[in-house]
Each structure stands twice: as C-alpha cells, then as structure tokens.
Amino acid sequence: MDVFDYEDVQLIPNKCIVKSRSEIDTTVRFGSETFKIPVVPANMQTIIDEPLAIWLAENHYFYVMHRFQPEKRPAFIKMMHERNLFASISVGVKDDEFDFINQLAQDNLIPEYITIDIAHGHSQVVIDMIQHIKKVLPKSFVIAGNVGTPEAVRDLERAGADATKVGIGPGKVCITKIKTGFGTGGWQLGALRWCAKAATKPIIADGGIRTNGDIAKSIRFGANMVMIGSLFAGHTESPGELVEEDGQQFKEYFGSASEFQKGTHQNVEGKRILVPYKGSISDTLTEMRQDLQSSISYAGGKRLSALRKVDYVLVRHSIFNGDML
C-alpha cells in the first residue's frame, strides 16, 4: 500500500483541448441533486448554520447541516422544503437518534440527505443506524462515516449506505491522531485511494484539504465529493465568532470533538484556532470553481472525469520547495 498525502503528489498535465476554462463543466450529480462543484463545507458549528445552508442550496451547492442542535432539525427540514430546497441533516447513533428517525417518518418529514456523523464510523451501531434509516426512510440518501479502510467502506455499503465519508483525524482542528495514535492524518490521500478502490458507491474525502489544488487531487484518487473545513472558516457568512487581535480580524474555528463544541473536557479530539477573516464565501466558492476548471484543463478534458485518468508523481513533501503555506 502506498502511503502519501496531498503535499506529496503532483498531477502530470495532458494536452489541453479547450480554448477557455469557461468551456469546462465542474458539476457533479450526487444523490438526487446536481451541484456546481464537488465540494461541501464541513458539517461543523463554526462552518455551517441555517442561513448559510439556505444560501448554499439556493445557489446549487451541497451542504450538510451539523447535528449539534438536534431539537431544531425537524423545523429545519420543514423550512427547507417550504422553500423548495433540499434538506440535508446529520444524525448521531445514540438511542434517541433512532427514535428521531422514527418521528421523521411519522411526521412525513423526509430529508433528501442524512449523514451519520461519528468519528469512528466502522462500528456496529453505525451499521444498525444505516439499516434503520433505510427501513424507515428509504428515500433518503444516506452518507455514513467516518472511515479509513476498505473493509469499513465495504461493510457500510453492504449495510445500505449510499455514500461513505473517508477521513479519520486529518483535519486542521482534529487531534485524533495525536490523542489516540489512530487515523489517516499524514496519509489521507493514500487512505482515500485505498478506500476508493473498494467502493462501488460515491466516496466523500473528508479532511486534510489545504489548497484548492487538493480538490483536484481528491477527485483523481477516487472522491466524488470533497468535504472541507478550514478553507470555509473565517467568512462573513461563517457562524464562528468574530474576534479582533492586534488590529486584525479573525473568526474562531473548532473541531466537532473539541471542548469548545462539547462544553466539557471529556474525550476531547479537537482544538480551537483563529482563522483570518476572509470576506464573502461566494468569492471563495467562485475561486474554487475556477481553479477546478483550470485543473480539468491541465488534465486534458472538459469534465471532472478527466481528472481520474491523469498520471501523477510522488515528490515527498517538496512541492512547496520549503515555502510555508
């Protein structure tokens, strides 16, 4: 098994066949919807909230609402449907979450997407939840995770998952690899490749994305969608608190298993950082799309599928030539 990460890889260009990158199509079909780019903001409290979810859906971007205000989820689904928008929620795996799924069916509140969101997704309780959702809400598209092995992907797909989320602790504010000794931190791209080879359904690469070029690399190694936290932190629309230090504006960004999210210092696997204020998220998404169009032009194609066929080289941490990002 090859072990490498995003900074270890450079994709090799093919002959360009377009006159302008505006000819290039970056759209992706995922579940029942088609989205402008294969990118989704992480379902974290400092990344996504209701106003941003509405904006993303209205503008044909995928989103996954976080699960940290569970009592608001039924009203959120209803509100999105009243706006003729898709509803995409997260659930955990505790007993009351099984009851919650039953209640949604009873109330005929059927979200288009349900993400089962726990740190170690290769577990029997996740399999039980997948099977429960598929039995009670068969029309919902079920995303399960997070995982880091082919065995996990196969098990969750067999249970009925429509997509799996790959990545255990590679994110900027996740310290699972430090606290537990386990995870895909430092070799996330290799883990993605390993898992994608076993997958028969879509894969979401989750974590470790530091640059827009990493999106293209994720597609090359098997991702259908790329979940990103840090690049989406710090915007006007980001729910994180705006703070000022030494005359510079920042927004806070913390992991889903941090004490800042949990409100307690038990089983902490996340940390809090301050991200420089970045302005509008619309500008960031536009730049991502344009950079992805350029990536596809270098791949010699007009669609995302061209990225899957390019050759690559391993350069072992040298692509930045010693420069820090």
UniProtKB/Swiss-Prot annotation:
It is an enzyme of class 1 (oxidoreductase). NADP(+) binds at residues 203-226. Keywords: NADP, Oxidoreductase. One of its GO terms (biological process) is purine nucleotide metabolic process. The active site is at C174 (thioimidate intermediate). It comes from the Bacteria. PROSITE patterns: IMP_DH_GMP_RED. It catalyses: IMP + NH4(+) + NADP(+) = GMP + NADPH + 2 H(+). GO terms for cellular component: cytosol; GMP reductase complex. GO terms for molecular function: GMP reductase activity. Its EC number is 1.7.1.7. Catalyzes the irreversible NADPH-dependent deamination of GMP to IMP. It functions in the conversion of nucleobase, nucleoside and nucleotide derivatives of G to A nucleotides, and in maintaining the intracellular balance of A and G nucleotides. Belongs to the IMPDH/GMPR family. GuaC type 2 subfamily. This is GMP reductase. The gene is guaC.
